């Protein structure tokens, strides 16, 4: 199966520039799903957009957005095109989108880490990285919902040394991802995407930069794998 996908990627690489090929290869090799970010009910567009950009910058491939009262919107000038490269999953259906999101992440094997002060919290430097984790961030005003706090596996905080009690959410995400990414880099944990995942991601990215990318993929598959 992977060989087939490699053939599809080779077809795309035959029509995109060598510089793009090199860029895709380099970035895909540093992408991760070991960490994923969850935004719950974020209402400020500039914060939501900045988080998307931070995910791309730190190699986080998946961003999960829970829309309860507020719709997730991206400001292009802030996101700087990050939405093309990061996989965005929206949870806005059903009676409780927050619990729907958490359940899906737990089914994928993620530990749920709530970024909120708690009697049992640890700092981002102390957080156990031995299991894939979903980092949940809430609004600056209300924070993370009680539904998520009740089912969270761990609680984490950023050390503070001033009078202000918290960072802006986009700053909190950037600091957290920076610290955890560096810790993963220094660890022996297998946190990178598998070769199969990297190939699939590079195919997806190739389609995004080409006009009629989806149609091209269909044509490649028909030509390469049609039955005799």
Model-derived segments and their meaning:
Residues 1-15:
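N-terminal-biased segments
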Residues 14-120, 179-185, 189-228:
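RNA substrate-binding interface of SAM-dependent RNA methyltransferases
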Residues 40-41, 137, 161, 165:
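Glycine- and other small-residue-rich loops at beta-strand/loop junctions that grip anionic moieties
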Residues 50-51, 77, 125-126, 147-150, ...:
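Short amphipathic alpha-helical segments
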Residues 79-84, 130-133, 175:
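Short, hinge-like loop/turn segments at secondary-structure boundaries
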Residues 114-160:
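Active-site/ligand-binding-proximal alpha/beta "capping" segment
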Residues 148-197:
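Structured adenosyl-cofactor binding patch, chiefly the S-adenosyl-L-methionine
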């Amino acid at each position: 199966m992977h060989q087939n996908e490699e053939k599809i990627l080779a077809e795309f690489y035959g029509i995109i520039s060598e510089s793009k090929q090199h860029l895709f290869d380099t970035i895909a090799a540093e992408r991760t799903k070991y960490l994923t970010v969850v935004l719950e009910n974020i209402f400020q567009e500039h914060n939501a957009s900045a988080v998307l950009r931070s995910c791309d910058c730190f190699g986080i491939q998946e961003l999960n957005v829970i829309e309860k009262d507020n719709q997730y919107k991206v400001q292009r000038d802030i996101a700087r095109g990050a939405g093309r490269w990061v996989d965005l999953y929206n949870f806005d259906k059903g009676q409780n989108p927050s619990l729907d999101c958490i359940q899906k992440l737990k089914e994928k094997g993620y530990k749920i880490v709530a970024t909120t002060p708690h009697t049992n919290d640890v700092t981002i430097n102390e957080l156990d990285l031995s299991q894939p984790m979903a980092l949940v961030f809430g609004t600056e005003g209300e924070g993370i919902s009680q539904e998520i706090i009740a089912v969270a596996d761990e609680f984490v905080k950023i050390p503070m040394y001033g009078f202000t009690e918290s960072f802006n959410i986009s700053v909190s995400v950037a600091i957290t991802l920076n610290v955890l990414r560096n810790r993963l880099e220094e660890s022996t944990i297998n946190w990178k995407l598998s070769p199969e995942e990297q190939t699939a991601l590079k195919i997806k990215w190739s389609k995004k930069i080409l006009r009629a990318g989806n149609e091209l993929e269909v044509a490649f598959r028909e030509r390469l794998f049609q039955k005799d």
